[in-house]
UniProtKB/Swiss-Prot annotation:
Family: Belongs to the HMGN family.
Name of the protein described by the UniProt record: High mobility group nucleosome-binding domain-containing protein 3
Species whose genome carries this gene: Gallus gallus (Chicken)
Major subcellular location class: nucleus
Keyword Nucleus: yes
């Protein structure tokens, strides 16, 4: 693997590649203009939160027994039982119309 060349030890034709280049100067036209002033940032509105408004969420991953009991009656039946009940209702409505 070749060794890295340092600017101090530059020799021959590689010397031009290794020499440090001076930064380019700005044109007189650009340097004559002052920099545009930065617009002042608008103050952000902060909302004040009352310390007592935070609600208790409880432990994550656990459900209260009250919530489980309330959900049991309203959850749709598993394995399509709910669909079977709906089908029976539509059939009975069709029988009444005939």
């Amino acid at each position: 693997m070749p060794k890295r060349k340092s600017p101090e030890g530059a020799e021959g034709k590689d010397a031009a590649k290794v020499t440090k280049q001076e930064p380019t100067r700005r044109s007189a036209r650009l340097s004559a203009k002052p920099a545009p002033p930065k617009p002042e940032p608008k103050p952000r509105k902060t909302t004040k939160k009352e310390p007592g408004t935070k609600a208790n969420k409880g432990a994550k991953g656990k459900k209260d027994e009250k919530q489980e009991a309330a959900k049991e009656g309203t959850t749709p039946s598993e394995n399509g039982e709910n669909k079977a009940e709906e089908a029976q209702k539509t059939e009975s409505v069709g029988d009444k119309n005939e």
